[in-house]
Amino acid sequence: MSKLNAYFGEYGGQFVPQILVPALDQLEQEFIKAQADESFKQEFKELLQEYAGRPTALTKTRNIVKNTRTKLYLKREDLLHGGAHKTNQVLGQALLAKRMGKKEIIAETGAGQHGVATALACALLDLKCRVYMGAKDVERQSPNVFRMKLMGAEVIPVHSGSATLKDACNEALRDWSANYSKAHYLLGTAAGPHPFPTIVREFQRMIGEETKQQMLAKEGRLPDAVIACVGGGSNAIGMFADFIDEKNVKLIGVEPAGKGIETGEHGAPLKHGKTGIFFGMKAPLMQNSDGQIEESYSISAGLDFPSVGPQHAHLLAIGRAKYASATDDEALDAFKLLCKKEGIIPALESSHALAHALKLAYEDPNKEQLLVVNLSGRGDKDIFTVHDILKEKGEI
């Protein structure tokens, strides 16, 4: 029986109740078979093209880095059906669930983007869908909650713990433990127990593959750096995967520094966490001196996660990728700038990556460089959050 590697260096693994091991084994075997099955790959490809709208554009910015020698491109995952990169891998996993004969889908969501993507895939493929969402996130992401319900999903608010994404993850795993024979747990990021980090990476890797081809067509060379925000890390690993072996391309992940790393109110476990066991995996984790999981914080619900995918931890450990962070204010400034200068409203998550790219462009305006930011989602869901903050600051 062929097996995928469960670890990335020392990170990853499968720390779950014994009852879930057969379900994870089945998932791994079906994934391996599906990857070798031309008809599965063809169906996935057709859904991505005809339904989701791939390939997405690689847009060269016109004004935002005008006074520098940087060329900045945006990989437009915001143009994907559903509004973010999430749709890619959800379609892949939903097809896998059907292949396994599962009729129900369980999911967790933070910003609601993964929930929306799961709901649309379930509507399309005729699967029953229930989504766990922290009660706090239900409040701050009401448009997405309604979108899920419109597409037939049941949204279950989670009131335990911090009532955010980590609690929704725990509840979803609990549900799956009780119902794995008929339900597939459609995990929303490149984290959690093996084989999820690998499956999600493979179902997102077209982001980097397309970027590579588009960049060669437009510029005749590969970019100097690809930059992506990191919460759980799926949009980033989707961008990085095809560039890992291209040693001249820097891989830069951007974690949320929240109100500032020094305040403790952030979501940057890669650079400021300790290794621990959470959500079925061994990975960097925000924890206090007693080893208790600390609350993560970010202006963007989708980055508000106290851990991170194991492959990112490994890429950092071996020095292949670099991880920076951007504060709420820096992300907000980048958000406003992209709206005003390019006519694109980005997700607050993606704005963290953009903030770092702008920093690179402006710290040495005379440096010639070719940068790509993965614009992982659109910002419609964030306009009310931004409105309230700008109002509070007296800017509107």
Curated annotation (Swiss-Prot):
Keyword Lyase: yes
Entry keyword annotation includes Amino-acid biosynthesis: yes
List of residues that carry N6-(pyridoxal phosphate)lysine: 86
Domain of life where this protein originates: Bacteria
GO cellular component, one term: cytoplasm
Keyword list, A-Z: Amino-acid biosynthesis, Aromatic amino acid biosynthesis, Lyase, Pyridoxal phosphate, Tryptophan biosynthesis
Cross-referenced InterPro entries: Trp_synth_b_CS (IPR006653), Trp_synth_beta (IPR006654), Trp_synth_beta/beta-like (IPR023026), TrpB-like_PALP (IPR001926), TrpB-like_PALP_sf (IPR036052)
Subunit structure: Tetramer of two alpha and two beta chains.
Name of this chain's protein: Tryptophan synthase beta chain
Organism this protein belongs to: Francisella tularensis subsp. tularensis (strain SCHU S4 / Schu 4)
